[in-house]
């Protein structure tokens, strides 16, 4: 089968389509013919060597975490699925299995039936950022209509899910986005939108109970200027060194630095599936063909787009 892989750290030039053995299923696994997969920041962070502590330096490495497709084979102990089911899910180890391939084998616990109302590209956009959004809301603690929340970088894939899921809590949500993202942020539930091309959010006088930085550009040190005396800064894109440092810093301040790390689970996915049934908007900004993979990753890494980027096979 064909799969996107790389043999050394670097930019998109190191990516290549390689021939790999078609995987076979074990008793608790399913074989999925991939119809679409999506791109996440961790794909290029690992490829560029920014996460060596986690990824190691052994090659070749595959890439891609979440996918959608059709089941072609089922292990003997798998229940609840059948051959021909349209599903979406996440691979167990993106550097080994990699969703960016014609076939993936995954435990049945890491796939879910695709709602008929959404496309394969939309379904493949759910697992990583969707579960991250649910995790972030859990980290926020008790949210009510008096809770003020600032979402920086609100119209990327993470923000798309987060803004819509936050609506049910009635919190006062301010989104920071570009001029072209204002319409989307409002549609997804933001009460107020700050256009970062016209206003520096760090220079305003308003302070917040919760600040979440989805862009990775604000940082805890800067965010403290717009945080209430007792507040939370949520960081879903931490550098490895920030994880232990945040624990130490939190001992000495009421402005807490909270690291958001997530992994898909049944409870999280149930929340997302219910949201899809209730009209959750999944904006796929652009869909590329498998042969356009380098162009797709270059486009994704450049940023500045609304929603998610997907590749169809």
Which residues does each PLM region occupy?
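A short acidic, Gly/Pro-enriched loop at the edge of an enzyme's catalytic core
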Residues: 203-210
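Short glycine/proline-centered loop/turn elements that form peptide/ligand docking sites
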Residues: 75-77, 173-184, 217-220, 240-241
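Mid-domain Rossmann-like dinucleotide-binding core that forms the NAD(H)/NADP(H) cofactor-binding site
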Residues: 124-195
